[in-house]
């Protein structure tokens, strides 16, 4: 069986979820994922001027299309720039799936450069937030994220993606 990276698996999952448009801003922890998104031709990635705008653009996209808004930012300040937009989406019941880059697993909790506990910071303004700890869990977490964002009272979901998890190879 052919093995693919977590980055390729996420791109595949976006297509399976019917995500034809997303909003993304690349950075050190998400550059490989951004490269995978660039290589494919199904999901259009809109690059805003900065992260604060992109979560609001994803929110507006969700409100105007009835689809789940999707966005991608890097770690640290990229992730914290989502907070106001996530709060808005939460209070207005707008379905979003937001991906944040994160430092490698062995650096989490060690005050690494641009490491921030974004799941903890956004706990009260998201329906669900998780840091992906194992490559094997990625597919399940992605399916759950879209399901949770759109069911019941819609709202934002945050998936934190450690760089090493996304680089790992595994089954498709």
Language-model features: locations:
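N-terminal alpha/beta PP-like core and its mobile active-site loop of ThDP/TPP-dependent enzymes
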Residues: 1-172
